Amino acid sequence: MIVREWLFFTMAPCDAAEPWQLGFQDAATPMMQGIIDLHHDIFFFLILILVFVSWILVRALWHFHYKKNPIPQRIVHGTTIEIIRTIFPSIILMFIAIPSFALLYSMDEVVVDPAITIKAIGHQWYRSYEYSDYNSSDEQSLTFDSYTIPEDDPELGQSRLLEVDNRVVVPAKTHIRIIVTSADVLHSWAVPSSGVKCDAVPGRLNQTSILVQREGVYYGQCSEICGTNHAFMPIVVEAVSRKDYGSRVSNQLIPQTGEA
């Protein structure tokens, strides 16, 4: 039974922070997958450098001991080794820099014609969302507030201090534009599984794009210190199928907006 549970939690996607977690959450977007791949590539080069430098250090300590070489050699110049130690690190830096720059510039790209635009507004200390592509019967955009569920009132299976009363529902495999701003102080809209962290600045509109590739529930938090309850501003993005998303919009968001 224990082995079965271990296999389940090991193979299941990790879309929320876990106790003693050291690695990344599982990627839900191509952007996050690129970040993870870049991290692994850089880590590979770091291991090579660590092994090489450690080998040189151990070799120097072993061979150049004062008992073995009481009279040290005086070497003031070595053209070959100087060329190697200049060219070799430059090649490594090129292998690291080229994919990192490509990923960095792709983060700034915004989809020209997104299928859905969602506006996320930060408040002290909750969030409000606006689906500007849909209008209710009274010609109002679909809006709702999202508050954290108190830590003393979670339901079975909910994450402590990460669950909200109203989730952001998005369709999977669809280009989505997120417009981020703030109504009071600096906030941030960050969801690690999607590889997105966008600052919410009062009086300014920042935007980012996401393409969630699989259905699931993704958790995030405010990543900008914004006051006393900074830790109580979670973000929950629920990615569903396009068919389910359409029914959610018609059955939940529109009635909710009408009541507001």
UniProtKB/Swiss-Prot annotation:
Residues in coiled coil: none
GO molecular function, a single term: cytochrome-c oxidase activity
Residue intervals passing through the bilayer: 42-58, 83-104
Keywords tagged on the record: Copper, Electron transport, Magnesium, Membrane, Metal-binding, Mitochondrion, Mitochondrion inner membrane, Respiratory chain, Translocase, Transmembrane, Transmembrane helix, Transport
Ligand binding (Mg(2+)): E224
EC identifiers of the protein: 7.1.1.9
The organism's place on the tree of life at top rank: Eukaryota
Residues in the Mitochondrial intermembrane compartment per record: 1-41, 105-260
Database matches in Gene3D superfamilies: 1.10.287.90, Cupredoxins - blue copper proteins
Residues at which Cu cation A2 binds: C222, E224, C226, H230
Binding sites annotated in the UniProt record for Cu cation A1: H187, C222, C226, M233
Mitochondrial matrix side: 59-82
InterPro entries: CcO_II, CcO_II-like_C, CcO_II_C, Copper_CuA, Cupredoxin, Cyt_c_oxidase_su2, Cyt_c_oxidase_su2_TM_dom, Cyt_c_oxidase_su2_TM_sf
A single GO BP: ATP synthesis coupled electron transport
Family annotation (Pfam families): COX2, COX2_TM
Family (UniProt): Belongs to the cytochrome c oxidase subunit 2 family.
NCBIfam families in the cross-refs: CoxB (TIGR02866)
Protein purpose: Component of the cytochrome c oxidase, the last enzyme in the mitochondrial electron transport chain which drives oxidative phosphorylation. The respiratory chain contains 3 multisubunit complexes succinate dehydrogenase (complex II, CII), ubiquinol-cytochrome c oxidoreductase (cytochrome b-c1 complex, complex III, CIII) and cytochrome c oxidase (complex IV, CIV), that cooperate to transfer electrons derived from NADH and succinate to molecular oxygen, creating an electrochemical gradient over the inner membrane that drives transmembrane transport and the ATP synthase.
Quaternary data: Component of the cytochrome c oxidase (complex IV, CIV), a multisubunit enzyme composed of a catalytic core of 3 subunits and several supernumerary subunits. The complex exists as a monomer or a dimer and forms supercomplexes (SCs) in the inner mitochondrial membrane with ubiquinol-cytochrome c oxidoreductase (cytochrome b-c1 complex, complex III, CIII).
Protein name per the record: Cytochrome c oxidase subunit 2
Organism of derivation: Beta vulgaris (Sugar beet)
Protein encoded by which gene: COX2
